[in-house]
Amino acid sequence: MNDFLTVKVDSKISGVLSFEENEYIFSYKTEDKKDFISLTMPVRTKSWNSKNLHPLFEMHLPEGYLLSIIKKHFSKFTKTDDFGLLKLMSPSIKGRVSYEQDLKVELKPLVLDDLLHSSNEKLFDELVSRFALNSPISGVQPKVLAQIENKATLKLEDYIVKSWGEEYPELALNEYLCMRVVQKANICVPEFYLSQDRKLFIMKRFDIKEDNTYLGFEDMCVLFGKNRDDKYEGTYEQIAKTIKTFVSPKYKKESLENFFKMIVINFLLKNGDAHLKNFGLIYDDISNIKLAPAYDVVTTTVYIKNDIPALHLLGSKKWWKEKQLLRFGIEFCDLTVKEVSELYSLCVRAKDEIIEEAKIYKNDEHLSEFIDNLIGKWS
């Protein structure tokens, strides 16, 4: 295989990524400043060189469960190092940044109602066998990216379908209830569902516009210039600073308010996996950059009793209470005393409302202990 990929932005050739003498080299082939591949890699004559795969490209690589499945099936036939994986996945990578390919991937779409109401015990395994190679999404949780028909809208749209293993019981329900808290706190979230058998959490991609063109999306690993192995290295203060650096003036206040609420909820719900890859920015051009919707929120302490926050806050990885969280909002999110107090109260009310919603699941005797445990973790 040739060790290069032609990179496109909004379907136009932007540059070439190559791997030469153990170095990754990206060279722009355009002079149009709008065709930048990353907010941190503007168009320029000089190439962008790196010993590791550039974080923007690495963002497209699978991790954990998906990575193990792909390596198991394809390591006999092709290299499965970072560049080999990117080449393998590139035909299915759709977004503002994509790759020129001769091969066109066509897969029969699924129907949303069928996923939500299926009684097939092996459904997720079947989804993996069909969609694993077409799922350029990061994260260690078992998940695939699938095209699904929504009968309500009659549209074919991309959804992320997540499942869970025996070591993380009821993870789909956990994430669903946590995301309901986020939604109740008036934070922008993607469309999401829980299947009737609670085996699947299904979330719509949030970087696709109504006209089926794509928004740019970059997670904080990309914006920090870090590789995925460093996603637990950093602070929430640094994320706030990055928001202030990159977000457009007209969206800055709203983005900082939402980020503050995200942090409050992650602490209230004891989400120890709110790392750099679980926050990001979206944009359609350089003048319209804002905080991405919230995603991947779970109560990790249900499974890891003594889990701690993913990143440092106020110099420590501990579950700070109201006083310290309000201080964070004032000092680093540029909010007033009145604003942080009101936003914090909104998050607490959202959590309390969803606790009442969660209690409905206690009618199922198999869920009663799990729900009690989950609610007990929510401070």
Model segments located where?
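Phosphate/dinucleotide-binding and metal-coordinating scaffold of catalytic cores
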Residues: 1-272, 276, 280-379
